[in-house]
């Protein structure tokens, strides 16, 4: 519920505040386990104004992805990168977890990856998942701005 309240507040319309919220969530997990979380957010990515739907969906995509990396993939390292090139916001989350085969998951009809894809589609973003057994996972979201 607090995520929805945060997303609808007009004061939180900057990408910088969204990235800070993602980092705060990751920090909570980092304190609970041996998890090394590193974020690299380019200045240009911090200066974007995002609408409520964009903030909510991007935040929830990466909140779920960070949680999954921690709980299911048993990752010990998570890297979060964001950049903006003038018309495209690109956000990449990668981990060193055990990975999985995205083709063998029930991602379209079930939860998990299906939710991530649905959230990206709702805001006109593209979501790409690259993963393989014992090779970690990389989730990339690109959003035209």
Q: Where do the PLM segments sit?
A:
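Helix-loop-beta hinge of the Bergerat
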Residues: 16-54, 121
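Acidic ATP/Mg2+-coordinating residue in the GHKL
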Residues: 95
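Glycine-rich G1-box
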Residues: 98-99
